[in-house]
Amino acid sequence: MYQKSALELRNAVVSGESSATAIAKYFYNRIKTEDNQIGAFLSLCEERAYEKAAIIDAKVARGEPLGKLAGVPIGIKDNIHIRGLRTTCASKMLENYIAPFDATVVERIEAEDGVILGKLNMDEFAMGSTTQYSAFHPTKNPWGLSCVPGGSSGGSAAAVSARFCPIALGSDTGGSIRQPAAFCGVVGFKPSYGAVSRYGLVAFGSSLDQIGPLTTVVEDVALAMDVFAGKDDRDATSQKFFTGSFQEALSLDVPSLIGVPMGFLDGLRDDVKENFFASLSILERQGSRIVEVDLNILDHAVSVYYIVASAEAATNLARFDGIRYGYRSPEAHSIEDIYTISRVQGFGKEVMRRILLGNYVLSTERQNVYYKKGSAIRAKIIQAFQKAYEKCDVIAMPVCSCPAFADGEILDPTSLYLQDIYTVAMNLAYLPAIAVPSGFSREGLPLGFQVIGQKGKDQQVCQVGYSFQEHSGIKNLYPKGCNKLVDGEVK
């Protein structure tokens, strides 16, 4: 059963081949047997899941119509609210916070008969690219337990890779869906800004954040987006971009012109560069034409991103002060102590580093030098993409300059920030992007291929990703070496 896609599991429930309860039980068995070595989940919601599964099975028995996600097990990143469950953001600051409402994406999942299994680990407040910054435990990469799974949605990527669920929700502020997807050999999709409601997502960078799915195959991205996408009046930034179905769009003709920023590929490791150009050749053989585009301004994207993201994070996280929200230190005996001691004890080092950076670039003395200048360069990045799209339909890039690295191999914060060089620009420019598995590094670790589209043309991005998947034959990758559980039995 672990080899089935979300769409195949849904069809099994609809046909009566399997029940939603049996599917939920099977995947909980996998999680309880295997997740102790991976650490993908922070919490499970078995009672809620089995209640939902029983409702679905009763619908089947009565012959009632079923939702698009009927019986599909889904994991939720722990910065997305599920009413009555903890939303910790993998932080001591919110360790005991119980969400009072459901996020819009959670409402839409359950309205379409999806079965939510639990909350997934992440870098604290989504700040990081390793999922080693969780306050509770690190997550390991199913392809190599000594390697990081990427981040900040590392728990989501690891859960899908290890087949704990066929769909997981993540959030992407600067690559936090796509980079872990590439590291763990799964598909990760960042929709256009505003395509999926952010209501119920704990904000990191409000002009950058976007919720999206991680799956084993592109077809399941399309299935998920047909549920998640759409305007939501509770999120002022949400828009209605799409009229047709994502699933139907996969069968349409693939765009013919693919732009490649050749001048932006110098930092790639040799085997990663070779894999990228081999991936382009697969699309060329299907009739696409490669054209060079000028995106050299993206050399500044990481600097701009960390100015903008840190400024927005400092503002968004100001509410977590031990008074309005979050951990209050028992050592605090005055208002000043509550603010200072609670935040020092409640936040991890990386979160504090970014809050300090954000407050610095927003300070009166430095705002013009950093924040306003960074915002101006962001506008030029958007213009550069617009000009590039005059020559092509979509743009292709690697996801990362290297495969997953060992835990502790990169400790310098600046070096870790540079890991985002091929992903942050899409968030700065509000663009949709998909990461699909494209093969393996010389160490045998997964690599990813990234397709970026114009804002609102998410379906076109998925078309190209699907075409690449089908013609490369690289799909449904499974790290057999790290799992003992096969078909419900421990081997």
Curated annotation (Swiss-Prot):
GO terms for cellular component: glutamyl-tRNA(Gln) amidotransferase complex. The keyword ATP-binding applies. Its EC number is 6.3.5.7. Belongs to the amidase family. GatA subfamily. Allows the formation of correctly charged Gln-tRNA(Gln) through the transamidation of misacylated Glu-tRNA(Gln) in organisms which lack glutaminyl-tRNA synthetase. The reaction takes place in the presence of glutamine and ATP through an activated gamma-phospho-Glu-tRNA(Gln). It catalyses: L-glutamyl-tRNA(Gln) + L-glutamine + ATP + H2O = L-glutaminyl-tRNA(Gln) + L-glutamate + ADP + phosphate + H(+). This is Glutamyl-tRNA(Gln) amidotransferase subunit A. PANTHER family: GLUTAMYL-TRNA(GLN) AMIDOTRANSFERASE SUBUNIT A, TRANSAMIDASE. NCBIfam families: gatA (TIGR00132). Transmembrane segments: none annotated. Heterotrimer of A, B and C subunits. The lineage of its organism: Bacteria, Pseudomonadati, Chlamydiota, Chlamydiia, Chlamydiales. The active site is at 77 (charge relay system), 152 (charge relay system), 176 (acyl-ester intermediate). Keywords: ATP-binding, Ligase, Nucleotide-binding, Protein biosynthesis. InterPro entries: Amidase (IPR000120), Amidase_CS (IPR020556), Amidase_dom (IPR023631), AS_sf (IPR036928), GatA (IPR004412). GO terms for molecular function: ATP binding; glutaminyl-tRNA synthase (glutamine-hydrolyzing) activity. Disulfide bonds: none annotated. GO terms for biological process: translation.
